[in-house]
Amino acid sequence: MDDDDFGGFEAAETFDGEQGGNQAVSPAVPWATFPAVSGVRLSPASPELILDHDRSSPSSGHLRSDAVISSPDDTRADSSLVNQTISKVQLQQSAHTHLNIPLFPLGLTDESNHGALALEDEPEGPGVHVSNSQLRQKISSLETKLKASEEEKQRIKKDVESLMEKHSVLEKDFLKEKEQDAVSFQARYRELQEKHKQELEDMRKAGHEALSIIVDEYKALLQSSVKQQLDAIEKQYVSAIEKQAHRCEELLHAQHQRLLEVLDTEKELLKEKIQEALTQQSQEQKETLGKCLQEEMQKNKETLESAVKLEKEAMKDVITKAVEEERENLEKVHAEEREMWKTEHARDQERVAEAIQAAVQEQQRMSQEAVKAAIAEEQRRSEKAMEEAVKRTRDELVEYVREQRRLDQVTRQRSLSSLELFLSCAQKQLSALIATEPVDIE
């Protein structure tokens, strides 16, 4: 055990020799001071080593008491005996210094165990008796200080144990506090996660509601356009019946132009609505995908415009040829169909009305299916867009463009089928009108 275990030290005492020469200093154990003995040097030692040394054999590493006691018969050999004792002590000190064993000269341990030193009791040495009494006093004070140091040591050990217990309690409290903080942080993190999920769900619901509103508006516009189309067809039908045969060509041409305009209007409306839905659902990806989307939209627009132009030219040529051929056929079969017109006129009107109604219903059904397909595709793409990375967005846009082209093709085919149906009905009406003309016009 270190010397610092016993608290602060005082200044070490010095020991003077008989001639006032060499001094013995005890820097490590301030209370281990001994009376001045001529030529004796004291080695430093701690109280624990003293106790251990006391429990060991008296003969190991110490001088016996009789080594320093003068014989009563040989008082004159006192100085020589002291010199021999000093030489032995010095030899033992030099030997025990290398072995780290404390050496107590003059047999102090044995003296403390037995309670007194056996000193020379010759009447000639009064100074020796005085030194013996002083030595006894020092030994008693040494024992008292040793006991006090042991008590201090026990007290310090108890304080250390109490401090260690307090440290363990504080450490446990600190760990509990950290665990509570970690639990609170985790709870806060979960709350933030739930809040974030709820906000994402609200945004998704808002997007779906906006899309449903757009779809309802598109349905209303589509119904109004279909209604307008029906009104225009009925008006054209009445005017075609009332007018002469040479007005049929102009009516067909005007109807064809109106159908093409309605087709273009529906395409533009569908394109605008889809663009608005895409803009609302891809606000977060607008910066990275805006340029690509604009390029694709421009290409799609140019392709659609070129396709519409080609289709208009082709349809114009086909309708012109069909009208010319039909006119020739009508002139050939005019005489044959004049007699059958009376019986088939009413039937033709019913068939035309049914055909128009069927065409309108088919148009509505196909429009609803196309809108549902577009909505389903848009919902699927919006859900994927919220989950997938930015690099997949380009592929989704390409797929959407292809789907849009397919829908445009379906719409175009549907319009062509309705136009074909209208032309067939108009052909029958023209044949009926030609059949009802008087013979003198012919």
Swiss-Prot record:
Keywords associated with the record: Coiled coil, Golgi apparatus, Membrane, Phosphoprotein, Protein transport, Transport
Topology in the lipid bilayer: Peripheral membrane protein
Record's subcellular location: Membrane; Golgi apparatus, trans-Golgi network membrane; Golgi apparatus, trans-Golgi network
Coiled coil: 127-213, 248-409
Modified residues (Phosphoserine): S43, S46
Location of the region described as Homodimerization in the Swiss-Prot/TrEMBL record: 211-414
GO biological process: Golgi to lysosome transport; protein transport
Region (GGA1-binding motif): 1-16
Ranges where the record places region Disordered: 1-27, 48-79
GO cellular component: cytosol; membrane; trans-Golgi network
Oligomeric and partner information: Homodimer. Interacts with GGA1, GGA2 and AP1G1.
Role summary: Involved in the regulation of membrane traffic through the trans-Golgi network (TGN). Functions in close cooperation with the GGAs in the sorting of hydrolases to lysosomes.
Record-given protein name: Coiled-coil domain-containing protein 91
